[in-house]
């Protein structure tokens, strides 16, 4: 459920991990000393070799698909800046802050880049791996010059002065506004029909990377589960999860909530300590070649009182049935909103309604290179499911002041229905298969 950005906000664990365990120059996570790890973590083996990178040919196919969608949506070009859509179509990892770096991809003709002059070396290094990167059209601008005029000039040279430009949804307003003023005859609109139109439908390679990410996440969670003990804080657990990911060859983290704080879907900064019978909720995932996992497991350490245990198990069973119901409802042609409704009905019929009272959020979100991306399992969303769409499936029941239980796995739509990339959690006491 929790996005990578949101995780950094709500959990002090992530920030500490990022400082304590920097990446090596190769991009591989620094592996901890096995002797300092609990046995369940020390025995983990790296799975990094199983992750096959996305190729230039695949990115070229994506650009051709984008051009087709531009034609279908009457767009003359799309403008991409730093972020996952730029990486999706080119493989470029870019950060630039307030200085604009952009790719303009026309429906017809050659793409061009606009880049700060002092960043030209870094830009050419990355562009060389992108489709058409051998001889790119790269337009630079000095610190006292306008990058927007470079965009306008590139459009003019391609006969697109009065064209319709799709702006990717994460582009900052100041950049979009600058382009609009420099190219006043152009019409600016959303690029989402093109960018999401490509990204919502995953290739077999993308699904394989996501499936590996999910398997790695469950392996990390299970190893940490066997190392839990009374007296640990949520930060202790988070540190172990980060260490487990490094053992497995990847970088990841988790938001960890204990006891009554598990009733807050996105958690709390309040210091929390695991006690006998505590519910522990672990949520988030890892990155495998740019593709994300997002899994939640809720478990109990030791034995709660009979009364509390009975209530917890009853709630777990309801949430489990809700997840099963949404999985059964999902298939090509079904609207996203109907999948949310299937899970919500189970929870409401079991007495945890009405509506959003205890199941306080939508059922799920699209998954891929972003932890949260289009489309969404939410009431009113009429987007129809298609094969190879991927989503989180994460019903939950949250009882303020007591506990919350959420189960989250990644769902992929198949030609005949849907399946989870990992098996459902069997129970609170035995959360792993």
For each of these PLM feature ranges, what is it?
Residues 2-433:
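Active-site neighborhoods and metal-handling regions in enzymes and metal-associated proteins
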